[in-house]
Curated annotation (Swiss-Prot):
Topology term for the membrane: Single-pass membrane protein
Modified residues (Phosphothreonine): T77, T88
Positions bearing Phosphoserine: S49, S72, S97, S1050, S1073, S1081
Protein keywords: Isopeptide bond, Membrane, Nucleus, Phosphoprotein, Transmembrane, Transmembrane helix, Ubl conjugation
Chain segments carrying region Disordered: 1-47, 1047-1241, 1273-1295
PANTHER family the record matches: ARM REPEAT SUPERFAMILY PROTEIN (PTHR48287:SF1)
Annotated Gene Ontology cellular component terms: cytosol; nuclear membrane; nucleolus; plasma membrane
Family: Belongs to the RRP12 family.
UniProt biased composition (Basic and acidic residues): 1089-1098, 1153-1172, 1230-1240
Protein name per the record: RRP12-like protein
A UniProt-annotated Pfam family: RRP12_HEAT
Composition bias, Basic residues: 1285-1295
Phylogenetic lineage: Eukaryota, Metazoa, Chordata, Craniata, Vertebrata
Gene: Rrp12
UniProt organism field: Mus musculus (Mouse)
Length: 1295
């Protein structure tokens, strides 16, 4: 233990020491902040000023007028001079007056720089301010042209690099907005000034000025017309810009390359009506690139070559065909250097060329095909991961573009590529197999699928494109051989896409593959059954089940000797994938088979073979489950349905086990198979047969123990069939149903069932039938039987819900009668009927006009009371109706605020009624405040809040609960300024709550306090509440502090992980659209500055990194072999190189991440305290009334658990408050109490020390600590093992 007062070793060097005699000084040596403060109080700063001699000189010259703007400018660039003498002058001005009040929007970005500490930004601000003052002093209007003239004059006068950079930056901004005629007229003088600066600054140490001058020159060239490019001076200036694309400094080089791209792609005349196919400077640009590459192509580092390849990557699609060919030949030549980076850049250039999809004048089909053929000589090794991935991507884009240009030629090349790409599935790298699979999928979708219909039938003996398709399929089919067994999952995915793309036309050549797949599925322990089922399913979808079953018969006919059924797995596959096929095939093939199997099952059941009978019964049921798929967009409804209809009717009527399936098939056929008028008419013709059967089934009572699902399916089928049934037939059914309802002999169940049918029939009847129906059900609206009354209101609801047709016309013509009926039946409405009744009123209120305001006013008391109904549906409907009434009042009046106030006045009397009425009225006002928060006046909301605060003094819990809900919504809705006036009132009202109320609503009060403390601070809320609330407030502050700290730690952990993974993140590709090229973003500087160091480190690692793959056996490597380039690897060969990082997510078979969402995202947000305003208001509304009680209880329990605090003080910290809890050693729970060693305990795992798999331990810093702990754990185990071994040896030695 060290001596008292002695610092730990290594600390003394870090501390600042006092000089002798200054140990009592308390003021710091530096006073930077004090000086900054003094400068704000009109005193001169004592420190070094940023004002330079050049800035003073420039300011003096501008003020003295020696840099006049009109001497050498054209008339259109001069400023208008006011001949009259000005009799007013500016009373006061500062150094930056011209900046702060600059009226030109071009420099709005610069106005943000004045607060910056950067010297460059301050220089820009100073120059802009000076130039603006000069323009104003000469009577200018601060146009872009005037700024251009002033800045050009200033550029010739400045001397320091900082001022030159500032002027160039401002010119870069203003040049984009200067009219093109001005720039064309002043091209000679302006370009000469730029070229002089470029030549002077070319070897300068500073890069800023040169970068912005290069950007200005590019903008100037872009604005020239086509005629100007015919002059030698224009090309000479352009070549000056082009020469900087190989500059040694990256920022300058990048600015020049960006400028060249913007000139070739974005010149103004390239977007005109008579735009040339290629820019006039494209030829010289291509020749320059080729010349530079050939000049430096043989050097070791190939730096210039890389620079030119970077430029070519963007420029290649802009060249004419001849130059594209020359450039491509140059690219292919430099790829023979086997330089890793050069090859990668060349591949990027080819990728961009094909991805741009240029016109045939740039890339013809023949040249595209020649490049594709040449790239086969540069296939990387299968062990070379990144180059092989790049090669596959380039070939994918090349073939897609080739097929776009010439279909037959492209398909001819695809056959060879498929053979090469399939061999990539043998690569030891899973990424290569996944990339090859994805590449072939894209080619099938982009190149084959769109053209397969034009190609026609594909057979083995065909020639031309069908032959190419056959070769491609054979290459993929070869993947089913055993040598590809590790990649069978990828092969099956490819086969599925192939079936989907070409199955309809190419099924003759695919039948053998289907047989192979079925045989493969029967092989023992086959691991990819799901992928195989998907592939066969794709074949079923595209070819149809008829073709698939011809290739692989089902082999089930009811006469089997064994019960193996090896191909029964086809039935679920067909069920899940069959669609758009012949419905007649089900009638002719599957229906007889199902009948045979059912008869076989019945025979076996009679013979006592129960198990065999069940198997055949299951098979026939599986066959029937295929029917909904066959009814999904069938191709022969008109021809086949009549042969199937009788069987379906019989099955519905006599086969309860098939009822749900057949009803589903009918619904699917009507909704998805009757789009054609002929098909619709054919199915509608059988409505008179199906609907009576369905009516009868629905009218039958459910037997004890049976499920209600078949009955619901029957009713849904009735509703669906009625959509295509003729109105005359519907009227006849409705008349019969009405008679059944009125029949005194009908039982209650029958009457309720028939009323359900009437509900379904009503919307499809004509107006006369609906009128008659209304007269029939009107007495039932006041029925004593609650179920009948509810059904009657349901009928009325369906009629009122129709927005058009006979039902809508009936509502309009009988509106007064409906209003009277609904008002008269108000007192006799039972609780179960409230929901349909309220829905009727919702539909009616939507159609009302201003003269019906009294009707709405009469409904309000009932609707308010319904907000406390037992049924959640009734409560929701009541709130919806309240909102609709509000919208109705808004329709009635011109002034929305007054109209809403008139509506609220009708609700206010409820606040003076009985307890239930008061509670319901507060709930209604809460909901209206939430819905119409933007339309209610501030005074209205404040008045409501004051009245609700008075109601907090109520002794009834319901009233207090509703009042607290209102306050919670008001806190979220109201502006903080207006809410602040009433904080004291709210807090006083809450403070006067009784102990019982405070205890009962503790969680609601806690939530309110949290919201108030977040808005107004802890001290204010604490000062307004009595002492008994202070403990709760302190707990809230602690919980908020903990939550904030937890969020900060989580954020820090995330940032730390991102920093560690930064090096492995892929570089985001820059956009290559013309808009992005022309947007000269200043943000690129900072990004480039950050990324440059990382890129240099990466280049240093990758430069000259290559490996040679030795020859087989003892044979030496032959360097004269033309294919020796394939043995130059960019990746170190051999497995096990490097470690795979675990990113916390599972990977699928093709390498994609499997990310599962959290089960309850809202709960996470609540724990973090980051809920938005919308979520707060929604929670407040749900908390007010609409949520179910079970959900509220569960949330309350969660909140109480979350907000629970430790009951007593726990030691911690440092010194005497060090942590007292000892950390349990791994495996301590298995240690024996009396003897040595471990013991196995009941209900636990074996006695080992288990190391938890914690993802956070993958952190580089924490990993070392874990390794040390693990080593200690292993050593302890070894010591225990040795001790046990010695004891056993002693025991053996004893006699």
């Amino acid at each position: 233990m060290g001596r008292s007062g002695k610092l730990p070793s290594g600390v003394s060097a870090k501390l600042k020491r006092w000089k002798k005699g200054h140990s009592s000084d308390s003021n710091p040596a530096t006073c930077r902040h004090r000086q900054a403060a003094r400068s704000r109080f009109f005193s001169r700063p004592s420190g070094k000023s940023d004002l330079t001699v050049d800035a003073v000189k420039l300011h003096n010259e501008l003020q003295s007028g020696t840099l006049s703007l009109g001497k050498s400018q054209a008339p259109e660039t001069t400023m208008d001079q006011d001949p009259e003498v000005a009799f007013t002058e500016k009373s006061s001005g500062t150094f930056l007056s011209g900046l702060s009040d600059c009226t030109n929007v071009t420099f709005s970005k610069v106005q943000r720089f004045w607060e910056s500490n950067s010297a460059a930004h301050k220089e820009i601000c100073a120059v802009l301010a000076a130039v603006t003052e000069v323009i104003r002093s000469q009577g200018g209007k601060e146009t872009e042209t005037e700024y251009f003239a002033a800045l050009m004059t200033t550029m010739e006068a400045v001397e320091s690099p900082e001022s030159l950079a500032a002027v160039a930056y401002l010119l870069n901004l203003v040049l984009k907005r200067v009219p093109s005629p001005v720039l064309m007229k002043k091209f000679s003088d302006t370009s000469k000034a730029f070229m002089d600066i470029m030549s002077a600054q070319a070897s300068s140490g500073s890069t800023s000025a040169l970068r912005w001058v290069l950007s200005c020159l590019a903008i100037l060239l872009r604005k020239q017309d086509l005629e100007a490019w015919g002059y030698p001076i224009t090309l000479q200036v352009y070549h000056g810009l082009l020469s900087f694309t190989v500059h040694a400094k990256p920022k300058i080089r990048k600015a020049a390359q960006h400028g060249v791209c913007s000139v070739l792609k974005g010149s103004d005349f390239m977007f005109g009506e008579k735009a040339p196919a290629h820019h006039p400077a494209a030829v010289s640009t291509a020749k320059f690139c080729i010349q530079e590459i050939e000049k430096s192509g043989g050097s070791k580092e190939a730096t210039t070559t890389l620079h030119m390849l970077t430029l070519l990557k963007d420029m290649l699609p802009c060249f004419p065909e001849g130059l594209v060919k020359s450039c491509s030949e140059t690219l292919l030549r430099v790829m023979t250097l086997n330089h890793v980076l050069v090859t990668a850049c060349a591949m990027q250039a080819f990728h961009n060329l094909f991805h741009a999809k240029p016109s045939p004048s740039t890339l013809s089909a023949e040249l595209n095909a020649q490049i594709v053929t040449a790239l086969y000589d540069y296939v990387p090794s299968e062990n070379d991961l990144q180059p092989l991935l790049a090669w596959l991507k380039v070939m994918e884009k090349a073939h897609i573009n080739l097929v776009r240009l010439q279909r037959d030629l492209g398909l001819g090349h695809l056959a060879r590529f498929f053979g090469t790409a399939v061999t990539c599935l043998l690569s030891p790298h899973s990424q290569v197999a996944a990339a090859a699979t994805q590449t072939l999928k894209e080619i099938l979708k982009e190149c084959v699928a769109p053209h397969i219909a034009d190609i026609g039938s594909v057979t083995s003996s065909a020639s031309g494109p069908p032959q190419y398709i056959t070769k491609m399929f054979r290459a993929v089919e070869e993947g089913l051989t055993y040598k590809f067994h590790a990649a069978w999952s990828s092969v099956l995915q490819l086969l599925g896409v192939f079936f989907e793309a070409c199955g309809k036309q190419a099924h003759p050549v695919m039948k053998k593959c289907l047989q192979s797949l079925c045989d493969l599925r029967l092989s023992p322990h086959f691991p990819h059954t799901a992928a195989l089922d998907q592939a066969v399913g794709a074949a079923v979808t595209s070819m149809g089940p008829e073709v698939v079953l011809q290739a692989v018969p089902l082999e089930i006919d009811g006469s089997e000797e064994t019960l193996d059924f090896p191909r029964s797995w086809l039935l679920p596959v067909i069920r899940d994938h069959v669609r758009e096929t012949r419905l007649g095939f089900f009638t002719t093939y599957f229906l007889p088979l199902a009948t045979t199997l059912k008869r076989k099952a019945m025979d076996l059941a009679q013979a006592g073979s129960t198990v065999e009978s069940k198997i055949y019964d299951t098979l026939q049921w599986q066959i029937w489950t295929l029917l909904p798929g066959f009814c999904t967009r069938p191709t022969d409804v008109a021809a086949s349905f009549k042969g199937l209809a009788r069987t379906l009717g019989t099955a519905i009527n006599e086969r309860p086990d098939l009822r749900v399936t057949v009803c589903q098939a009918l619904r699917t056929l009507i909704t998805k198979g009757c789009e054609a008028e002929a098909d619709r008419a054919e199915v509608s013709r059988f409505a008179k047969n199906f609907l009576p059967i369905l009516f009868n089934l629905y009218g039958q009572p459910v037997a004890a123990g049976e499920a209600a699902a078949p009955r619901r399916a029957v009713l849904e089928t009735i509703k669906t069939y009625l959509t295509i049934t003729e109105a005359q037939l519907v009227n006849s059914f409705l008349e019969k149903a009405t008679e059944k309802v009125l029949d005194p002999a009908s039982s209650d169940f029958t009457r309720l069932s028939v009323l359900d049918l009437v509900v379904a029939l009503a919307p499809y009847s004509d107006e006369a039938a609906i009128s008659k129906l209304y007269s029939t059900i009107r007495p039932y609206l006041e029925s004593k039987v609650h179920g009948v009354q509810k059904k009657a209101y349901r009928v009325l609801e369906e009629v009122c819900a129709s927005s058009q047709g006979p039902a809508a016309r009936f509502v309009q013509s009988h509106l007064d009668d409906l209003k009277k009926t609904l008002l008269d039946s108000l007192r006799t409405t039972s609780s179960p009927a409230k929901r349909p009744r309220l829905k009727c009123l919702i539909h009616i209120v939507k159609t009302l006009s201003a003269e019906h305001e009294e009707f709405i006013a009469a409904l309000i008391p009932e609707v308010i009371l319904c907000t406390k109904e037992v049924s959640v549906g009734a409560r929701k409907s009541a709130f919806t109706l309240l909102v609709e009434m509000g919208h109705a009042f808004l329709r009635f009046g011109s002034n929305q605020e007054d109209a809403l106030q008139r509506y609220l006045v009708l609700i206010y009397p409820g606040l003076l009624g009985a307890v239930t009425t008061v509670s319901c009225s507060i709930l209604a006002l809460t909901h209206l405040l939430f819905e119409f928060k933007g339309l209610m006046g501030t005074s209205t909301v404040e008045q409501l809040l004051e009245n609700v605060c008075l109601l907090l003094a109520s002794r009834t819990r319901d009233v207090v609960k509703s009042a607290l809900g209102f306050i919670k919504v008001a806190v979220v809705v109201m502006d903080v300024v207006h809410l602040a006036k009433h904080v004291q009132l709210v807090m006083e009202a809450i403070g006067k709550l009784s102990d019982d109320m405070r205890r009962h609503f503790r969680m609601k009060l806690r939530n309110l306090f949290i919201k108030f403390t977040r808005k107004f601070g802890f001290e204010l809320v604490k000062g307004l509440l009595p002492a008994e609330y202070h403990k709760v407030l302190i707990n809230i502050r602690k919980a908020e502090t903990r939550a904030k700290k937890h969020r900060a730690l989580s954020q820090a952990a995330v940032e730390e992980e991102e920093e560690e993974e930064e090096e492995e993140e892929p570089v985001q590709s820059k956009g290559d659209s013309i808009e992005e090229i022309l947007a000269d973003s200043e943000d690129e500087d900072e990004e480039e500055e950050r990324g440059r160091g990382k890129e240099q480190r990466k280049l240093a690692r990758q430069r000259s990194r290559a490996w040679l793959k030795e020859g087989g056996g003892d044979e030496p490597l032959n360097f004269l072999d033309p294919k020796v380039a394939h043995r130059v690897l960019a990746t170190q060969p051999g497995p096990g190189r490097g470690k795979k990082r675990d990113h916390g997510f599972k990977l699928s078979a093709d390498g994609r991440l499997i990310i599962r969402e959290e089960e309850d995202g809202n709960k996470v947000e609540e724990e973090d305290g980051t809920k938005g305003e919308d979520e707060d208001m929604t929670d407040a509304m749900e908390d007010a009334s609409v949520r179910s009680k079970k959900k509220l209880k569960r949330q309350r329990e969660d909140e109480e658990d979350e907000l629970e605090i430790p009951p007593r003080y726990q030691a911690g910290g440092s010194g005497i408050h060090r942590p007292v809890a000892k950390k349990a050693a791994p495996g301590a729970e298995y240690k024996a109490k009396k003897a040595k060693g471990d013991v196995k305990k009941k209900g636990r795992l074996d006695p080992y020390a288990y190391v938890p798999l914690n993802r956070s331990k993958l952190n580089r810093r924490k990993k070392v600590k874990l390794q040390g702990q693990f080593k200690g754990l292993v050593k302890a185990t070894q010591r225990g093992s040795q001790a046990g071994h010695k004891l056993r040896r002693k025991d053996r030695r004893r006699p």
